[in-house]
Amino acid sequence: MNSKLKANGKKEVDALTFAKRLRETANQLGFSKDVLRRAVNEGFSGGEKKRFEVLQMSILKPQLSILDETDSGLDIDALKIVTEGVNNLRSKTSSFLIITHYQRLLDQIAPDYVHVIANGRIVKSGGKSIAEDIELSGYKKFG
């Protein structure tokens, strides 16, 4: 975190301030206190790993986050926590590239733009209605 702050010409934070911010954010995402004592992703379930990614984004506040099939393997409760976390991070200074095969994620994180990739190329771009159409008719027409 301090590397990012320093690179942006901002004041670094001390270890106690960082630890407090980390605990508060972890608590908001439903993590137990013992999670912060583990190494990154050590002994985490699939859902915990996805929630931990949201924790990292909440702390680091990147300008661009790439979420590759972040809904994969999540139960409905974990999906809700992850999508609420992402929605809370949305701002004019942050962008998300969300890669998914399923409408259920896009029902909870409304995309500004949808791009369909087939055979390594973007074959269609537009609004959320593209994803809704794919949910109904599949990917067949995209090759």
Task: Give short role names for the model-derived ranges.
Residues 1-62:
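ABC-family P-loop ATPase nucleotide-binding domains
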Residues 66-70, 77:
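Walker B catalytic motif
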Residues 75-80, 125:
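Conserved D-loop-proximal element of ABC-family nucleotide-binding domains
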Residues 79-92:
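Helical segment within the ABC ATPase nucleotide-binding domain
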Residues 93-109:
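Conserved H-loop
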Residues 97, 114-115:
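Conserved catalytic/dimer-interface elements of ABC ATPase nucleotide-binding domains
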Residues 117, 121-143:
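Conserved beta-strand-loop-alpha-helix hinge in the C-terminal portion
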